């Protein structure tokens, strides 16, 4: 009989309780009980204990918010009760007309209403069975949405298990996923520093974060969820909207504190004006108020139109919008090579701030809005966020304007500009050479999983580039003690240690070197596959996209990216300089006779006889590769205890599944 480690079990229960309480205090009471560092330390400890004791892992543990393996495409979620949108009004007359229709439909003037902020985010339906979160989906067309369950599970104020009592066996909660304005600014700052396109507004940031195929990315985004309604329920939830929202709060949801009961027109307008005055200081973007008939029986009497309920209306705030002229459109190159069109605007005051530039994001956005130099445009600045060109006023377009097109050559380094399939961004392909990408390329090259040059961190890279000592990654190998000692906080001993690290990195492996080059779409796993297939760098550099696609986990997008990278003369020059500086590796000998030679396996669920990392190492030693997601190219899916959705997807695709015993037996089989 297996002995239970009571100490671990008790600590797991204690940590879960502390983390759930900390989440409630942070999100629902605005009174944090743990610092971020303390929270993270407890979460790490809990994850370690659960890994050590997989029999006590639970779907509602706080550790399950960190994200699941990436998916290739979102599944579908179907709604028995449509997830409808709302009709909008934009002034007092429009609101007054709506209220009059409601009063007429109910045959009385005294109609209690609820009023709450209209959060500017992404609508999501969350389904609970017996109190456990089992599914989450986006609005979609109202009947069918995208399955974003794994991503919603990472949102820290979404209860994975309902709290309190008397919750129904089946419950669908509907609400809005949003991102705080302060977090939005931080996120955009990080994206700009990384050379990525900034999000246009918090709504786009929330939607983009929630619709990540890799839920571990979503887990890093500070999203929040505010319920505003419900869908299916196995029992009636209450007699009024406000009463139901109070029950949702008791069950663990963060219900907005700005929910109010209001009655006649004057009171509604007064609350609308109050909220309009404080909206700029609110932690979340709101673009109006939603007024609803509070009584649920009265709602049934009013019913729905073809697209929206008659018993609710969105009363929108006026937007901060002004007209100005596009004086130029520039192609701006970010640190990762993404080229972003930027509109240079005739300076204009929008919401109290002078706006002279606005990101146009990508070529698709320019084409969709048909923005040209010389156009008069409407510029919006909703709250304190990045300005956005809303639309072109085409009646005022000057004659002889021309559509804007992305340059074919990088405006900074002259390398080829390429747009990969399934991407909206154009990129400069001169990643090793382009000055705009220099800092990012050097940091990545020196990182632990690449060339592993310890001591060559971000601040030192900034100094090396700023002082003109390093222009490409090859220049790292020409640094000397005298040059380094001229930098801030760099004494002789520190310089000698760094030079020793640089010298050590000259002897590397081909997979590390390929990963260090920073080729778009090439991570560590793909770098290893390329190295095993080609054995050395020269045949890889000469490979065509067609040849590259012979590698099991290399599709057309990766093949195109690799081929174009090595086709750039500037990149080839830097690689030649690295080799001339003594960077070298052993030729990779293809693994022969491995049981999983050339195969791709996926692991799901907990294994009894080995950890997941041990299983991965065993597969790689047998010539195989471990992937995080199931596709038609997957050879086997190894299914352990409590498997996730990967097993279901394997069944749908006809991919063979192995039990742990079958998997282990294959190592002793002859090929």
Curated annotation (Swiss-Prot):
Residue sites binding NAD(+) per the record: 36-40, 85-86, 116, 139, 176, 292, 316
At the top level, the lineage of the source is Bacteria
Q: Where is the BRCT domain?
A: 591-671
Instruction: Give the E.C. number(s).
Output: 6.5.1.2
Instruction: Cite the Gene3D superfamilies for this sequence.
Output: 5' to 3' exonuclease, C-terminal subdomain (1.10.150.20), 6.20.10.30, BRCT domain (3.40.50.10190), DNA ligase/mRNA capping enzyme (3.30.470.30), Helix hairpin bin (1.10.287.610), Nucleic acid-binding proteins (2.40.50.140)
* Enzymatic class: ligase
**Cofactor dependence:** Mg(2+); Mn(2+)
Q: What does UniProt list as catalytic?
A: 118 (n6-amp-lysine intermediate)
Q: Which CDD domains match?
A: BRCT_DNA_ligase_like, LIGANc
Q: Name one GO biological process term.
A: DNA repair
List, alphabetically, the SMART domains matched: BRCT, HhH1, LIGANc
Question: Does the keyword field hold DNA damage?
Answer: yes
A single Pfam family, by name? Answer: HHH_5
Under catalytic activity, the entry for this protein gives: NAD(+) + (deoxyribonucleotide)n-3'-hydroxyl + 5'-phospho-(deoxyribonucleotide)m = (deoxyribonucleotide)n+m + AMP + beta-nicotinamide D-nucleotide
The UniProt entry's GO CC annotations, sorted and at most eight, read: cytosol
Which of UniProt's keywords are assigned here? Answer: DNA damage, DNA repair, DNA replication, Ligase, Magnesium, Manganese, Metal-binding, NAD, Zinc
| Family annotation (InterPro entries) | BRCT_dom, BRCT_dom_sf, DisA/LigA_HHH, DNA_ligase, DNA_ligase_AS, DNA_ligase_CS, DNAligase_adenylation, DNAligase_N
Is Manganese among the key words of this record?
Answer: yes
- Write down the SUPFAM superfamilies for this protein, in alphabetical order: BRCT domain, DNA ligase/mRNA capping enzyme, catalytic domain, Nucleic acid-binding proteins, RuvA domain 2-like
User: What family is this protein classified in?
Assistant: Belongs to the NAD-dependent DNA ligase family. LigA subfamily.
Q: Which HAMAP family match?
A: DNA_ligase_A (MF_01588)
Q: What does this protein do?
A: DNA ligase that catalyzes the formation of phosphodiester linkages between 5'-phosphoryl and 3'-hydroxyl groups in double-stranded DNA using NAD as a coenzyme and as the energy source for the reaction. It is essential for DNA replication and repair of damaged DNA.
Q: What is this protein called?
A: DNA ligase
Gene name for this UniProt entry:
ligA
